[in-house]
């Protein structure tokens, strides 16, 4: 059974690349043609590359591996959060904090602070503090929560990254590469595919296209997890 159909890819507009003047020549092999100054991505290749990425994610997940979903551009934020939560994985959809991977211990301390504040709230510890102090703590919580809630349960480095637009998320990709963490990504015609281990050529600007491909990666995680359960 194919992971995705041509019809699904076409309907979501996965084939629309960027304007021809904004392109990376390394993406030439994934381009079918250009139409009215816009590159059209070869969906046969997208389907094939998505199959490869799907297999990788499924196998990783079956072995108990974890994936960090990354997409901070407006078109990706909702899909990244929804799909990561659906498959029980971690996500960053606001701003990538430099050092999230390469300085993981420090980031983890900030996460622990967030958990501590949440615990104080639950136990009613804030009610005994002066109002000014409470306001300050809640403001801190709001900021921490915004950037870190998606990685709150991530107690160690992830085994792979799934990225929407590696050009926009270049810091995340660079950190992953430095640590030899494989990167799966939706790569549009203006991106550098050499930075990515599992390239999925496609439109990274249309909400429907991003949602479709992100949901397939989440499906792969779920399928792998089911295999893991059966293997036990």
Swiss-Prot record:
GO molecular-function terms, A-Z: structural constituent of ribosome
Listed SUPFAM superfamilies: Ribosomal protein S2
A GO CC term assigned to this protein in UniProt: cytosolic small ribosomal subunit
Single GO biological process annotation from the record: translation
UniProt-listed Gene3D superfamilies: Glucose-6-phosphate isomerase like protein, domain 1, Helix hairpin bin
Keywords: Ribonucleoprotein, Ribosomal protein
Cross-referenced Pfam families: Ribosomal_S2
Coiled coil: none
Signal sequence segment: none
Cited NCBIfam families: rpsB_bact
Family: Belongs to the universal ribosomal protein uS2 family.
Annotated HAMAP family: Ribosomal_uS2_B
Identification of the protein by name: Small ribosomal subunit protein uS2
Source organism per UniProt: Carboxydothermus hydrogenoformans (strain ATCC BAA-161 / DSM 6008 / Z-2901)
């Amino acid at each position: 059974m194919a992971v995705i159909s041509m019809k699904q890819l076409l309907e979501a507009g996965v084939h629309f690349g960027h304007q021809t003047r904004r392109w990376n020549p390394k993406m030439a092999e994934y381009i079918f043609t250009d139409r009215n100054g816009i590159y059209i991505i070869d969906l046969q290749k997208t389907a094939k590359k998505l199959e490869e990425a799907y297999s990788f994610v499924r196998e990783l997940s079956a072995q108990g591996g974890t994936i960090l979903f990354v997409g901070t551009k407006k078109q990706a934020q909702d899909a990244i959060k929804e799909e990561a939560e659906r498959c029980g994985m971690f996500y960053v959809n606001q701003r990538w904090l430099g050092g999230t991977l390469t300085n993981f211990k420090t980031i983890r301390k900030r996460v622990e602070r967030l958990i501590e504040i949440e615990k104080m709230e639950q136990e009613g510890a804030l009610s005994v503090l002066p109002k000014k102090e409470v306001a300050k703590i809640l403001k801190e919580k709001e900021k921490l929560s915004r950037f870190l809630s998606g990685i709150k349960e991530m107690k160690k480095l992830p085994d792979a990254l799934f990225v929407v637009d590696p050009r926009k998320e270049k810091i995340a990709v660079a950190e992953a590469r430095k640590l030899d963490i494989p990167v799966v990504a939706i790569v549009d015609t203006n991106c550098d595919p050499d930075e990515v281990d599992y390239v999925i050529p496609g439109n990274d600007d249309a909400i429907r296209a991003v949602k479709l491909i992100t949901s397939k990666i989440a499906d792969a995680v779920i399928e792998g997890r089911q295999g893991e359960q059966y293997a036990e």
